[in-house]
């Protein structure tokens, strides 16, 4: 089996049949291009709608698509990522999630360092197909001021 053959096989999760499928390389490239395009659109939307100069100008944010088991499918940078969805899955069952749910947290400890400090806000939205969660779209961004002793949420006098 060559490297090209490996790229031509996709193993589906047991919940979706657990079968191995042969994937046409052209179809694979179309899917890859669609995922990249989706990530680029997420980036543009994040920058365009941001109120925080850290997001808008410094580009201190992350966008990505995860599967239902918290594995990265596609993202715009690789320095962040693992740990963004796992805290949500530990707190909420997939079966209890509903269309329209948005999950939000900013705790760097529960996400195993995927975000670095409390000003990084993570938002995750489950994606549904036929009533089942199949993926998550995830963003995080650095917000300048989330409250605290001093403007900017960072005070040298805090203990």
Predicted segments with their positions:
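Intrinsic disorder/low-complexity segments
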Residues: 2-19
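Conserved mixed alpha/beta core segments that line enzyme active sites in large multi-domain catalysts
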Residues: 44, 49-52, 71, 75-78, ...
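A generic structural signal for short, non-catalytic loop/turn and secondary-structure boundary residues
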Residues: 58, 97-98, 132
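Structured core elements
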Residues: 62-65, 104, 124-126, 135-138
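Mobile "lid/hinge" segments at catalytic clefts and subdomain interfaces of large enzymes
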Residues: 128-159
């Amino acid at each position: 089996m060559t490297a090209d053959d490996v790229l031509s096989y996709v193993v589906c999760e047991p919940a979706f049949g657990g079968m191995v499928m042969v994937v046409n390389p052209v179809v694979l490239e179309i899917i890859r291009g669609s995922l990249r395009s989706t990530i680029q659109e997420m980036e543009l939307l994040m920058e365009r709608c941001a109120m925080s100069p850290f997001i808008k100008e410094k580009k201190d944010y992350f966008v990505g698509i995860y599967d239902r088991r918290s594995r990265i499918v596609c993202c715009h940078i690789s320095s962040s990522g693992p740990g963004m969805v796992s805290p949500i899955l530990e707190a909420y069952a997939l079966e209890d999630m509903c269309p329209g749910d948005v999950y939000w947290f900013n705790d760097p400890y529960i996400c195993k360092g995927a975000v670095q400090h409390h000003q990084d806000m993570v938002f995750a939205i489950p994606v549904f197909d036929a009533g089942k969660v199949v993926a998550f779209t995830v963003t995080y961004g650095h917000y300048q001021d989330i409250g605290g002793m001093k403007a900017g949420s960072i005070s040298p006098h805090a203990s």
